[in-house]
Amino acid sequence: MAKENPPIVFGPVLSRRFGKSLGVDLSPSKKQCNYNCIYCELGKAKPIERMEEVIKVETLINAIQNALNNLTTPIDVLTITANGEPTLYPHLLELIQSIKPFLKGVKTLILSNGSLFYEPKVQQALKEFDIVKFSLDAIDLKAFERVDKPYSKDINKILEGILRFSQIYQGQLVAEVLLIKGVNDSANNLKLIAAFLKQINIARVDLSTIDRPSSFKAPKLSEDELLKCSLFFEGLCVSLPKRSITQAKKLISCGIDELLALISRRPLSAEEAPLILDSNAFKHLETLLNHKQITIKKVGSLEFYCAF
């Protein structure tokens, strides 16, 4: 019996951070990536410079159109990903420009490791997306080599590419930082990442740790450790895994000025607020909103209370 080809389109699946998502895999039958991350759930594979198996863009377009035509419920976002790194796909610009006209209000999202943002062709394609999410697990070179095991170890070139792209991109730019215990969770690495992200127009930081079996049996951080790591990202909208949020059992009791100072240092997610604020502090949010001292900023499907 002939083996069926893996599906190009999958879902819809419900994403807490982006809503109901229909996924598109640009490399469904083979892992093709320029990283070999120790947390990757796709298995170990030698990092490559370019895709060895390339699906025709017409095949991808037809698969996406068919999936959209057969949807029984509306979706929030079409997510371009890959069994590896989607920006390695050589026809990415043609693909996104071809599918946007028939998305009918559905947002477009790409999940990337951020390593090729310095390439003009990649930048041109990424500019077409409503949301671009990239990974930045390490800036410290030793940590970068250990956690991401990249094809190219030029972290400065990667950072320069992300910085330049952020200066021309008009959509929502989201960073993902995945921390491995004893590998990239040092204070030095966290300070470097936070300082870099504060330079760019970042909409949100998704901070997480291992939650699924990985290629190298990488150790995860505890809930408390991850919460402590989030404090390095002062002033940025930080999204933690839902399990981490529910671990915050101690309710914060504070006056309105203290709450405003807290939000000024670190935007507070609307999901997190009722879990960590006592009833009086939670009521202060409405007062601060009415007095236009804070505002609600939406990033993907998550909302944050932010100071002006």
Curated annotation (Swiss-Prot):
Residues that bind [4Fe-4S] cluster: C33, C37, C40
Source superkingdom: Bacteria
GO MF annotation, one: metal ion binding
Protein name: UPF0026 protein HP_0117
Domain Radical SAM core stretches: 18-248
Cofactor binding summary note: Binds 1 [4Fe-4S] cluster. The cluster is coordinated with 3 cysteines and an exchangeable S-adenosyl-L-methionine.
Listed InterPro entries: Aldolase_TIM (IPR013785), GTPase_Obg (IPR040084), rSAM (IPR007197)
Keyword vocabulary terms for this entry: 4Fe-4S, Iron, Iron-sulfur, Metal-binding, S-adenosyl-L-methionine
Protein transport among keywords: no
Annotated family: Belongs to the UPF0026 family.
Pfam families, per database record: Radical_SAM
Disulfide bridge map: none
Cofactor requirements of the protein: [4Fe-4S] cluster
